[in-house]
Amino acid sequence: MASEPNLRYPTEETGDRGPQGPPGPPGPQGPPGPQGPPGPQGPPGPQGPPGPQGPPGPQGPPGPPGPPGPSGLPGLFVTNLLLGIIILLLLIIVAILLVSKLVVN
């Protein structure tokens, strides 16, 4: 049956084809596409602020002992010598004052 010619519109009786109809309305929007690949890595951020100051370090070991001091006898001798000279000068001044007082009288 499908091989029989269409008898309702024989080719001899059909007229010229009419003008083309207007275009149909646009179809519905398609589904969204797949997600794209991730973008490239951004540049490194700025340097952060300096951290807090650390705790003080442990106390260092004690230093080596100092050299021995000078002997005490020469220092004592110099001190006694200076005191003796000062006392001697004071006695000479007192003697001069006493002699001058006696001479004036």
Swiss-Prot record:
Keywords of the record: Collagen, Host membrane, Host-virus interaction, Membrane, Oncogene, Repeat, Transmembrane, Transmembrane helix
Molecular function GO labels: extracellular matrix structural constituent conferring tensile strength
Cytoplasmic compartment spans: 1-75
Subcellular location: Host membrane
InterPro entries with a match to the protein in the record: Collagen, Collagen_superfamily, StpC
Primary localization class, coarse: host cell
Membrane topology term: Single-pass membrane protein
Location of the Collagen-like domain: 15-74
Annotated region (Disordered), positions in chain: 1-75
GO BP, sorted A to Z: extracellular matrix organization
Quaternary organization: Binds to host RAS and TRAF2.
Role, per record: Acts synergistically with Tip to stimulate NF-kappa-B activity and interleukin-2 gene expression by binding to host TRAF proteins. Activation of NF-kappa-B protects lymphocytes from apoptosis, thereby facilitating viral induced cell transformation.
Name used for this protein in its record: Saimiri transformation-associated protein
